[in-house]
Amino acid sequence: MGVMGLAHALYLRGHAFASPEAVEFNDEAMEAIAYYAYEASADLAAERGTYSSYKGSKWDRGLLPQDTIDLLEKERGVAVDVPRGGKMDWTPLRAKIAKQGMRNSNCLAIAPTATISNITATSPCIEPTYKNLFVKSNLSGEFIVLNPFLVKDLKARGLWDQDMIDNLKYFDGELKDIERIPADLKAKYLTAFDIDAKWILDAAARRQKWIDQAQSVNLWIKTPDLKTLSHMYRHAWHVGLKTTYYLRSLGAVSYTH
């Protein structure tokens, strides 16, 4: 099982991607997904038996993914900077797994979902919004598509008019130079290249403690440099991430535009 639509969920909850509230939501949502996925696998094990190499596994030894942070910390000899614990009572599920075992060796992995998220009209996996404005092409030609959540919020504030449409087109969907847009909406609709990677990594670390496999975590930097990359990847290591995926950057032409 994976995840997609995180950015849209945050819009609906009114949280900026780069915010403590968003980090907490990642933690709580992933905990709930993990709990019920692992419970379903334990129920399947009671019905059909455990997977072939279950004996001696971490599941068999009573270790859930969140428990392995302490193992990682002990192996490294350095603190893993991620809060332990969660909102749910895992005691009944631990007892169920101890009694019934697990049908699946791995239950959760967050894939990129770039294609299927388009089909289902939601945001890809756990990524921030890439752009608030983009151009789609079909047999009839090209047409502009705006972030529908942004449009809804602008209408609710009485800011949706032809001047706003023209400004959004002129600034390619970027909000920071449009004076009429309030600061809270600018924060809420920051796009991937304007979000500090620390927020992406902290949210990923909160998800990772519940995930038994791994996740596709892309990072965005407009103009990478050695110092920034060093700090970014060291932070990823300190918060216990298993992996990161692509590092996205802007070409010189895109950046100056």
Q: What is the predicted role of each segment?
A:
Residues M1, H15-T113, S216, M232:
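Internal maturation/activation junctions in enzymes
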Residues M1-R13:
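Core structural elements
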Residues G2-G5, G49, C125, G173:
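Glycine-centered flexibility motif
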Residues M4-L6, E39, P148-F149:
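A generic alpha-helix surface/boundary motif
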Residues P83-K87, K96-S254:
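Catalytic alpha/beta core of large soluble enzyme barrels
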Residues H257:
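Residue-level detector of conserved catalytic or cofactor/ligand-binding positions
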